C-alpha cells in the first residue's frame, strides 16, 4: 500500500502544480503575493487599511486552491466564472478607492508604497476581471450530426 501511495503522489503533485503554470494560476499567485506585500506595508503604517488586503489575499488563496484541485468541476452549484469575475472586479474598485485615499493623505514612506502597490493591484485585479469575464470565454457549439453528403 505504501508503494501505491508513493507512486500516486507525484501524479497528484503534477496535477496540482500544472494549474500554477497557467495564466489564471499565475494571476492568482501574483494577487496573493501582492496582497501580502500591501498588507505588510499597511501594517507598518496604518493598520486600518489592512483588512482589504487580508480579505483579498484569503479569497485569492481560496480560488487558487479551488482551481488547482479542480474543485470547480466537483461543485457545480456555484457559478465559478461569475464568482471569480465579481471578486476581481470588486477588488479592483476597492483597491482603487483605498489607494487614492491613502495617496491623498500623504503619510510615511510605507504608506505611500502601499498606495502605489494598491494602484498596481488595481491594474492586476482589473486585468484578471477582464480575462475571466464569462461572456468573453468561447462557447462550444454542437458538432453536426448529418453526414457531409446530406441526409440519406
From Swiss-Prot:
The gene is PLP2. It is a multi-pass membrane protein. GO terms for biological process: chemotaxis; cytokine-mediated signaling pathway; monoatomic ion transport. GO terms for cellular component: endoplasmic reticulum; endoplasmic reticulum membrane; membrane; plasma membrane. It comes from Homo sapiens (Human). Enriched in colonic mucosa. The expression of A4 follows a gradient along the crypto-villus axis with the most abundant message occurring in the lower half of the crypt. The lineage of its organism: Eukaryota, Metazoa, Chordata, Craniata, Vertebrata. Glycans are attached at residues 18, 108. The keyword Lipoprotein does not apply. This is Proteolipid protein 2. May play a role in cell differentiation in the intestinal epithelium. Keywords: Glycoprotein, Membrane, Transmembrane, Transmembrane helix. It is found in: Membrane. One of its GO terms (molecular function) is chemokine binding. It comes from the Eukaryota. InterPro entries: Marvel, MARVEL-CKLF_proteins. Residues 19-137 form the MARVEL domain. The chain crosses the membrane at residues 25-45, 48-68, 85-105, 112-132.
Amino acid at each position: 500500500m505504501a508503494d501505491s501511495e508513493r507512486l500516486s503522489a507525484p501524479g497528484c503533485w503534477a496535477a496540482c502544480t500544472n494549474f500554477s503554470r497557467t495564466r489564471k494560476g499565475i494571476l492568482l499567485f501574483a494577487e496573493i503575493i501582492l496582497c501580502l506585500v500591501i498588507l505588510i506595508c499597511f501594517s507598518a503604517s496604518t493598520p486600518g487599511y489592512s483588512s482589504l488586503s487580508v480579505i483579498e489575499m484569503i479569497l485569492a488563496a481560496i480560488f487558487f486552491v479551488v482551481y488547482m484541485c479542480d474543485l470547480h468541476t466537483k461543485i457545480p452549484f456555484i457559478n465559478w466564472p461569475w464568482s471569480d469575475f465579481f471578486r476581481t472586479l470588486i477588488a479592483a474598485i476597492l483597491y482603487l478607492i483605498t489607494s487614492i485615499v491613502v495617496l491623498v493623505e500623504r503619510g510615511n514612506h510605507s504608506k505611500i508604497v502601499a498606495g502605489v502597490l494598491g494602484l498596481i493591484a488595481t491594474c492586476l485585479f482589473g486585468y484578471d476581471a477582464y480575462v475571466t469575464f464569462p461572456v468573453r470565454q468561447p462557447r462550444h457549439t454542437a458538432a453536426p450530426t448529418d453526414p457531409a453528403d446530406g441526409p440519406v
